[in-house]
Amino acid sequence: MKRERGALSRASRALRLSPFVYLLLIQPVPLEGVNITSPVRLIHGTVGKSALLSVQYSSTSSDKPVVKWQLKRDKPVTVVQSIGTEVIGTLRPDYRDRIRLFENGSLLLSDLQLADEGTYEVEISITDDTFTGEKTINLTVDVPISRPQVLVASTTVLELSEAFTLNCSHENGTKPSYTWLKDGKPLLNDSRMLLSPDQKVLTITRVLMEDDDLYSCVVENPISQVRSLPVKITVYRRSSLYIILSTGGIFLLVTLVTVCACWKPSKKSRKKRKLEKQNSLEYMDQNDDRLKSEADTLPRSGEQERKNPMALYILKDKDSSEPDENPATEPRSTTEPGPPGYSVSPPVPGRSPGLPIRSARRYPRSPARSPATGRTHTSPPRAPSSPGRSRSSSRSLRTAGVQRIREQDESGQVEISA
């Protein structure tokens, strides 16, 4: 009995200690490994600038870690691999001179390109540790948004029009997202306001007077946000618009008619002035040629008159019709009585302009020629009906004319010599 009681007591004690033994058996033993942390999981980079993929690791080992950065694609691309900060192997050409490693395992990428965008994975391991630490960081690379502008076909619209379209346009920028503002506030939900799938185009259907306002758009991407200048959209009532358009059309028509009416006469007057100028030039050229020819011929005619005074007298006698009708009175009218030894010669009406001008100074005549002049004055008058008398009168007239021409030539020579 005593033996049975002792066995039961030992068994009960063993059952009491079994939970503690079980706990000791299932408690895990701490394993050595690398723990990696990162302050950010998403980094936004700008083309041409730098991005820091920051990480930190902890380990019980004091050895240098082996760090490996990869860019996850369909086939992972190794960016860099190092022991501590010392690069192992050769870098890819597209990453050469653009990366830098730090002691905590962080990676700095310089001169970012659009191709650098993606998910980066870092692996850090130490030889004494059993497990390797891993961490992923997402990197986006974008181009900043340039200032947008709202494009419209016209800033004025007629009330109750079918549709009116506004387009938000910009030159540069990647991954843009668009937001429309009315009077600086986001558009309210309205069935008349229709947006394109990318929200770049705003269409207002059945325009109302309340749509008369300032409109602008905001374009943004992960690295920038830019707002356009507002555009004023003016909505006219149909009646007022008709008045404005009709008035403007009438004014434009009147202006065109006035311009056309003024332009045509001016064109004709220009042609007329041009023809008159040409005619005047031709007339002046003809006058110059005629004056030159007259200047060449006048001196010669004067010389011929001096050389042949009888011919000049005959020509003048033919031109005149009075000497035959009153031959007795004409010699007296041509000469006037004067002091003895002087005679006054009448001016010759048909004298050529080429002859020299007589001086006002008078010179005494030769006494040998005065009787001829006296005979001319003392000749008795004859009846005009007698043929013999007309012949003698014409002869005396010719003699007196020749005598006067000779006296004029002599006086001209005396004046020239003086």
From Swiss-Prot:
Cystine bridges: 168-217
Cellular compartments per GO CC: astrocyte end-foot; cell-cell junction; cytoplasm; plasma membrane
Protein modification: N-glycosylated.
UniProt domain Ig-like V-type: residue ranges: 34-142
Ranges for domain Ig-like C2-type: 148-234
Modified residues (Phosphoserine): 280, 321, 352, 379
Topology of the protein relative to the lipid bilayer: Single-pass type I membrane protein
Chain segments annotated as transmembrane: 241-261
Protein name, UniProt field: Hepatic and glial cell adhesion molecule
